[in-house]
Swiss-Prot record:
NCBIfam families: PRK10886.1. GO terms for molecular function: carbohydrate derivative binding. This is DnaA initiator-associating protein DiaA. GO terms for biological process: carbohydrate derivative metabolic process; DNA replication; positive regulation of DNA-templated DNA replication initiation. The keyword Lipid metabolism does not apply. It comes from the Bacteria. CDD domains: SIS_GmhA. Gene3D superfamilies: Glucose-6-phosphate isomerase like protein, domain 1. PANTHER family: DNAA INITIATOR-ASSOCIATING PROTEIN DIAA, SEDOHEPTULOSE 7-PHOSPHATE ISOMERASE / DNAA INITIATOR-ASSOCIATING FACTOR FOR REPLICATION INITIATION. Keywords: DNA replication.
Amino acid sequence: MLERIKVCFTESIQTQIAAAEALPDAISRAAMTLVHSLLNGNKILCCGNGTSAANAQHFAASMINRFETERPSLPAIALNTDNVVLTAIANDRLHDEVYAKQVRALGHAGDVLLAISTRGNSRDIVKAVEAAVTRDMTIVALTGYDGGELAGLLGPQDVEIRIPSHHSARIQEMHMLTVNCLCDLIDNTLFPHQDD
């Protein structure tokens, strides 16, 4: 058991090192995409399933409340939090539409969809991205593995942050770290002296 614990830590560290080498440009582009949207008076919609839903909620909470320092609230909505809406849509046998319907209702040109999917193949996330495209929204996608179907939907203005791993747990850990990086970059860009 002790050896297995060391393996988990070692794999996580190795994934972090690989991501630190491969992802800074994509994370920086994503942060600036989010910042520009916010500066233009737009909002960020975010979605994910399972652990990715938790990461989406963490991002939205960090925008609305705060990340590490006090600052004004920023507009972000986690689409996976309203159980009544989610179950009403799913009850009509539209499971794949649980996020897309919300994107079509709430999303506007200039808004950003933060779509989080470990493999990039979750049908409801793919449909949300397709809906965001029809609303002239920009997409920031957090993925892993080969990026899945999600990667093929992104245009030149969109940003994919693909974790260099084929292990779901490692990808999800890195998604959380990436979300924290994005929150930090947004705060330090919009409120550079807030922590002084």
